[in-house]
UniProtKB/Swiss-Prot annotation:
It catalyses: Mo-molybdopterin + GTP + H(+) = Mo-molybdopterin guanine dinucleotide + diphosphate. This is Molybdenum cofactor guanylyltransferase. One of its GO terms (molecular function) is molybdenum cofactor guanylyltransferase activity. Its main location: cytoplasm. The N-terminal domain determines nucleotide recognition and specific binding, while the C-terminal domain determines the specific binding to the target protein. The keyword Iron-sulfur does not apply. InterPro entries: MobA-like_NTP_Trfase (IPR025877), Molybde_CF_guanTrfase (IPR013482), Nucleotide-diphossugar_trans (IPR029044).
Amino acid sequence: MSSQIDAVILAGGMARRMGGDDKGLVELNGEAMIKHTIDRIKPQVKEILINANRNQTRYAEFGFKVISDEHTGFLGPLAGMITAMGQTDADYLLVVPCDCPLLPTDLVPRMLAAIKAEDAEIAVASDGEYEQPVVLLLKPSLRDSMKAFLEAGERKVDFWYAKHHFVVESFSDQPNAFVNVNTPEQKQRLAMEITK
């Protein structure tokens, strides 16, 4: 039996390093950053949720359900994940950031295969050198664990998943897959990369 997989695109941060600009809505080669992300993951999942804590009306224009953190105060990616986990009845939830326009087109099948091979609860993507803590495939049933972790004052995603049976799936064959945009300079470099 095939697994049902939904996705959440995290666009709920404050983007301090981008001068406060909403990263998902910043244009890259004529399209909003989040549109590049949507195009990469849409063929791989059933439903997409967008986690946003500002500009919700603009995000809704992309045609997907927009959800805001149930824990207020910009508490980081865990808050967005918790909210999304409560909004899906899928077997797995794919978590990706809004500012990774080169995500692998085989992200879900490889991460799902890694989970099943190890009978794990979570798959974490890696670029071959570093884990990508906000590129995850996980079971929504882990929501209570994540919620307790956040409510205890913790914020680091990797500290949370280290408490569970997780597997790392390397995408070293796609070294630019997880390049993201945190500064205007990175945006300029990435725009050049995409046009190559």
